[in-house]
Amino acid sequence: MSNNPRITSKEFQGYAGAAQNAIVALSQAVANSSLEPELQQLVKLRASQINGCAFCTQLHLNESRHMGIAAPKLDLLAVWREAGVFSEREKAALAWTELLTRLSEHHVSDEDYAAVSEYFTPNELAWLSAAVAVINTWNRIAAPFQYAPPILRHAIQAVHEPAQV
C-alpha cells in the first residue's frame, strides 16, 4: 500500500455517491440490529484482516479499543481457534465470517450451517450474514483504492518513541 490513496473516500463519494449512501444505510441497519456491538466489531475486523484491507482493519481496531473490547481478543483474533479467549458464540460467528468472506474457495455446507445455527437464531443469522456482506463490500472499496489507515496520533508517537522498560 502506498501513502497516497488511488482515490480518496471523499472522491469515491463524489463518483459513486448513491452506491456509498446505500452501503452506509446497510451498515446502519446492521449496527441497529440485535447483534451485540462487540460481536459486530469482531466480525468486521476479522473479515478486514482476511481481505487485507489496511483501512478497515485499523478503523475497526480503533473502534474496538474505544468500545473497550479486551486487548487479548483483538491481539489474537487472527488465531481465534487456538486463542482460548472467545466464547462459543463468538467462535461460531468468526467461523461463519470466514466461510462467507472466502465463499469463492468453498461452499457453505449443511454442517457449517448447523454449527452456526447452534448459537444464532434464524433472525440473528440473517443479520450476521448481512454484517459479513457489508464489511466485505467496504473492504472491496477501501483496499483496491488504498485508503490510508486511520492511525491515531498517539499510536504514531508510540511507534517513534523508544519504549520505557
Language-model segments: residues:
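Hydrophobic alpha-helical segments
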Residues: M1-V165
